[in-house]
Curated annotation (Swiss-Prot):
<keyword id="KW-0413">Isomerase</keyword>
<feature type="active site" description="Phosphoserine intermediate">
    <location>
        <position position="59"/>
    </location>
</feature>
<dbReference type="InterPro" id="IPR011258">
    <property type="entry name" value="BPG-indep_PGM_N"/>
</dbReference>
<feature type="binding site">
    <location>
        <begin position="254"/>
        <end position="257"/>
    </location>
    <ligand>
        <name>substrate</name>
    </ligand>
</feature>
<dbReference type="GO" id="GO:0005975">
    <property type="term" value="P:carbohydrate metabolic process"/>
</dbReference>
<feature type="binding site">
    <location>
        <position position="59"/>
    </location>
    <ligand>
        <name>Mn(2+) 2</name>
    </ligand>
</feature>
<feature type="binding site">
    <location>
        <position position="9"/>
    </location>
    <ligand>
        <name>Mn(2+) 2</name>
    </ligand>
</feature>
<dbReference type="Pfam" id="PF06415">
    <property type="entry name" value="iPGM_N"/>
</dbReference>
<feature type="binding site">
    <location>
        <position position="439"/>
    </location>
    <ligand>
        <name>Mn(2+) 2</name>
    </ligand>
</feature>
<feature type="binding site">
    <location>
        <position position="181"/>
    </location>
    <ligand>
        <name>substrate</name>
    </ligand>
</feature>
<dbReference type="InterPro" id="IPR017850">
    <property type="entry name" value="Alkaline_phosphatase_core_sf"/>
</dbReference>
<comment type="pathway">
    <text>Carbohydrate degradation; glycolysis; pyruvate from D-glyceraldehyde 3-phosphate: step 3/5.</text>
</comment>
<feature type="binding site">
    <location>
        <position position="440"/>
    </location>
    <ligand>
        <name>Mn(2+) 2</name>
    </ligand>
</feature>
<feature type="binding site">
    <location>
        <position position="398"/>
    </location>
    <ligand>
        <name>Mn(2+) 1</name>
    </ligand>
</feature>
<dbReference type="InterPro" id="IPR005995">
    <property type="entry name" value="Pgm_bpd_ind"/>
</dbReference>
<dbReference type="GO" id="GO:0005737">
    <property type="term" value="C:cytoplasm"/>
</dbReference>
<feature type="binding site">
    <location>
        <position position="331"/>
    </location>
    <ligand>
        <name>substrate</name>
    </ligand>
</feature>
Length: 508
């Protein structure tokens, strides 16, 4: 092996005392490597990753930027620009949905994550779509998914109040159902969860909860002990069910957590689809997705991806380098699809290994997750085919950080530190130049006990260069960003970076 990129997902470097699990954890291995190797920090948010100013980074954007080696203008920014220019309602896919319901007399069903977290969606985009419906003179209904993960665990009450105010202002856009993202945005094939959100949208039999108003849905949930992420799917009095003649616009711009619900609503069932016996019979309506959720979906896409060319994976393949991508299922798409610039198919010489994430409701119940098995996969590969380049993701600091459980987050960080002690020596012994970094922070700020912080952070992330024993320890320059990682790997491999990669090697 020649080079290895080890992504410590959610491992940020804070400078405060707000329950920083990274600082509080006992991390002798990472500390030793940071001291022994060349150490620097990278920025991961805002314009440095193609997002609006002041917007925290996320795993999708982070891995996309890492693989592209340049700043890629994200869908979030493109949607914001369209709204600012007054072009959203005239977007071909969105205007097509509006035309459809204008012709049929049906309802435009807008659905998505209602928060200002900006990781999967932004509530302002949902507000703007309601305004589009009002401007066209058609009825709209909103199916609101509450956040509590990229935002405050109890911020949903305010977000839904804002949404209800938008509906009042425009005379349409009443909330028809409310579901926590735990149900509506599952990405781990927990189809029974997704089906519950589907049932609330279609008003199928078996919806357990009903509320007089959207805000009541979350306040009732709080009384049951469930915060925004876990609001059980609830129908709202007087809300419209998805029916024949209607149309759907799914406002989430991030794909991974929108795919399962889209499959159920658009009746997309490939031959090898396994949904644990879940059966649905949705009305045959157009389902517009804000971005391309899956290249196999036959859905109109409002903002198709502008896929970057000459990504890290493409360049490695062009130079006949074999590459191994390893992650547990929670982050598998990130080290494959997103790192490859939105490409579903592996490059020549690219091997992908997925390790199942633990089957637990939330990862504070098992902070180590599947990190040991991820490491074992690489050790087995080193003893076998020994690929030229490795990209690996340890999910723990991010996934456990999202629970807001400080003690569990400490355990998660320490679990990753233990794995680094097994992994890095083996990589160096195999001749690999290892790099440790992160895509964004999370476990570095868990807020306070009274006000847990479960979202990503704006803090910089580490970049540690660990050459093999025979290699030189070049210094890591200041001013680095995620776009500089791919050029750095190409540098140690002796490959010229493509001109489209505007990042530069971090090694001085």
């Amino acid at each position: 092996m020649q080079a290895a990129l080890v992504i410590l997902d959610g491992w940020g470097l804070g400078d405060h005392d707000r329950r920083d699990a990274v600082r509080a954890a006992d991390t002798p291995t990472f500390d030793e490597y940071a001291e022994r190797g060349a150490f620097g920090t990278l920025t991961t948010s805002g314009r440095d990753v193609g997002l609006p100013d002041g917007q925290m980074g996320n795993s999708e954007v982070g891995h996309l930027t890492i693989g592209a080696g340049r700043v890629v203008k994200q869908a979030y920014t493109r949607i914001e620009d369209a709204i600012a220019a007054g072009d959203l309602c005239g977007n071909d896919a969105i205007s097509g949905a509006l035309d459809h319901v204008a012709d049929t007399g049906g309802t435009l069903h807008v659905m998505g994550l209602v928060s200002d977290g900006g990781v999967h969606a932004d509530q302002q985009h949902i507000h703007a779509l309601v305004e589009c419906a009002a401007g066209r003179g058609v009825e709209a209904a909103v199916h609101a998914f509450t956040d509590g993960r990229d935002t405050s665990p109890t911020g949903g009450e305010d977000y839904l109040a804002d949404l209800e105010a938008v509906a009042d202002e425009h005379g349409t856009g009443d909330v028809a159902s409310v579901s926590g993202r735990y149900y509506a945005m599952d990405r781990d094939q927990n189809w029974a969860r997704t089906k519950r959100a589907y049932d609330a949208i279609t008003r199928s039999d078996g919806v357990a909860h009903h509320a007089a108003a959207a805000v009541d849905a979350v306040t009732d949930s709080y009384e049951r002990g469930d915060t925004d992420e876990f609001v059980e799917p609830t129908t709202i009095e007087g809300g419209a069910a998805l029916s024949d003649g209607d149309a759907v616009v799914f406002a989430n711009f991030r794909a991974d957590r929108a795919r399962q619900l889209t499959r159920l609503l658009a009746d997309i069932h490939p031959a090898d689809w396994d949904a644990d016996g879940i059966e649905t019979n949705p009305p045959a309506v157009p389902v517009v997705t804000m971005t391309e959720y899956d290249e196999t979906f036959d859905c109109p896409v409002a903002f198709p991806a502008a896929e970057p060319t000459d990504t890290l994976g493409a360049v490695l393949a062009a130079h006949d380098h074999t590459q191994l991508r390893v992650a547990e299922s929670e982050k598998y798409a990130h080290v494959t699809y997103f790192l490859n610039g939105g490409r579903e198919v592996a490059f020549d010489g690219e091997t992908r290994t997925i390790v199942d994430s633990p089957d637990v409701p939330t990862y504070d119940e098992q902070p180590a997750m599947s990190a040991p098995a991820v490491t074992d996969t690489v050790l087995d590969a080193l003893a076998g085919d020994d690929p030229d380049v490795l990209v690996l993701n340890y999910a723990n600091p991010d996934m456990v950080g999202h629970t807001g459980d400080f003690d569990a987050a400490i355990e998660a960080v320490e679990a990753v530190d233990r794995e680094l002690g097994r992994l890095v020596p083996a990589l160096n012994d195999a001749g690999a130049h290892a790099f440790l970094t992160a895509d964004h922070g999370n476990a570095d700020d868990l807020g306070t006990p009274a006000d847990p912080h479960t979202a990503h952070t704006f803090n910089p992330v580490p970049f540690v260069s660990l050459p093999p024993a025979s290699g030189d320890t070049a210094a890591v320059r200041d001013g680095g960003a995620l776009r500089d990682i791919a050029p750095t790997l190409l540098d140690v491999l002796g490959i010229d970076r493509p001109t489209v990669m505007t990042g530069a090697s971090l090694l001085e």
